[in-house]
Amino acid sequence: TADTPASYFTDVLQPTALTDSAISTRVPILMYHHLAEDVTNDEMVSPEQFEAQIRALTEAGYAGISFDELQAYVLRGEPLPKKPVVITFDDGYLSNYTLAYPILQKYGMKATIFSIGVSFGKDHYKDTDYAMTPHFGAAEAAEMAGSGLISIQSHTYDMHQWPPYEDGSAAVRENILQLPGE
């Protein structure tokens, strides 16, 4: 294990050339969910931890790229920065806007946020009174996308709140490779 964020990125994320491939640069992809001062699970990171990681990436010479830039490299051989990194956020939490976005702006680091459509701008689960961690809405998405640093993409419309998905029902297995005996 690494002792500091900088040593983690130095030790783990070194791009290495691939052999027998047209792709000559490995691109690390870092995935986050939610930033919070009170970290209560492995899907969360504090703003201080996140900033330390982004600072370490920047100091190590990494440049954030979008998935469009990665795709252009893979499909057309368009050049990438010397040390590219893709930073992603799943689900579209409001903290991506209020906490992560200012840090990404400070360091000029690009990121892609995969927002859940049905949760867009919401703080309650659909059709319920149950509170959920707030998600950013259209105004925040427009501001971030307009910055040129953030790309907003889809992370399903409603799959995260589909009852059979939540309760592990066999209905989830429809149209999926069958298991032996099915």
Locate predicted features.
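Short, well-ordered alpha-helices that flank and scaffold nucleotide-derived cofactor binding pockets
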Residues: 102
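Metal-dependent polysaccharide deacetylase catalytic core of the NodB/CE4 family, i.e.
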Residues: 25, 33-40, 83-85, 105-182
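Aromatic- and glycine-enriched glycan-recognition loops and surfaces
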Residues: 44-58, 92-93, 133-143
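N-terminal pre-catalytic segment of deacetylase/amide-hydrolase enzymes
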Residues: 2-85
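Substrate-binding cleft of extracellular glycoside hydrolase catalytic domains
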Residues: 69-70, 82, 86-94, 99, ...
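General structural signal for secondary-structure boundaries
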Residues: 5, 46, 66-67, 95, ...
